[in-house]
């Protein structure tokens, strides 16, 4: 897609429809929506390239678009962070960039186990892959539950990303994909909205952060031949049977992070696999029988307990609605359903049933082995259909087992 096509009314209007999802009750969204056609047309003109006279007298085509001021606020779960939320008009531009150009250009080189901000590769997929790695290590490596884990975390990841290094990596990727150079200029405008680091809250920041450590992912997988590795933004793990190898890798990782202008925090350590891996809100243990037990972190349970305590006083006072409580609890319940948490979730649901005077069902425990099996069958279906030169279906039924696949596969 060229820059002119990106700035066209049709593309920006589709981006506006995406940007307003889940935000139509907010004041800025309502203001834009009241005059959506006029605002989108005005935005299209602002993004257009203009002829600008340079100090030497030469005339150069330049993007003169200036992003609006962002809103800064703090979030306190799971820990205190400062979020820089862009204005709604900039959300439209960011959606146009990400949905039409940036996502495909950047994610093509990402490894399978680089999670976050990608379709089908969120926290649920990260937990499933960790469980798959632990089970596979137990069954195929022949080491049982004996082994070592390198668990790493980057200190102040988003705030520490150097703009010059990020732009250099970004330009190399976009040039390789044949992206219009003016798209890179527009992205640089959004990178420079802050003097240092990347703003939490911008849609592009998530992809930029993943791309910034994409080279690191490939080094771990290709240079060190590590099979059991996963990363979610700044949080990563490596499972290996050789402690000395992990010590060498850790030394090299520190040097590599230093070259990126980053630093591993104090939580980075090498420890026995039997201790379990703290990843994506769960503590995952590998037992002597090869089973993986995933327990919800204590702070997540405590936060929900405190929320319920607040709701028990705020709901009768009219400070929070029934719908808001149900949506918040349902989201937490869906996440907690990955672990051994049935009794805990049922206990919290019972308290809310007394408060709201309604029946609250809880999610069934999510079986990550079944999810992995269904995905494997879907891949097998696609391979068979390709060989038979048949049209691919966008969705594959979970119960469909094509001819040629053994019953126990």
Which ranges hold each PLM region?
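Beta-rich nucleic-acid/ligand-interaction surfaces
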Residues: 116-125, 237-240, 271-276
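Conserved two-metal-ion catalytic palm core of "right-hand" nucleic acid polymerases
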Residues: 1-166, 409
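Short Gly/Ser/Thr- and Asp/Glu-enriched loop/turn motifs at secondary-structure junctions
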Residues: 68-70, 230-234, 266-267, 400
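Conserved polymerase palm-domain catalytic core
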Residues: 59, 133-233, 238-252, 271, ...
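Short, conserved aromatic-histidine micro-motifs
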Residues: 50-56, 226-233, 303-316
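Right-hand nucleic-acid polymerase module
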Residues: 86, 95, 190-194, 247-248, ...
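A common structural junction motif
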Residues: 254-262
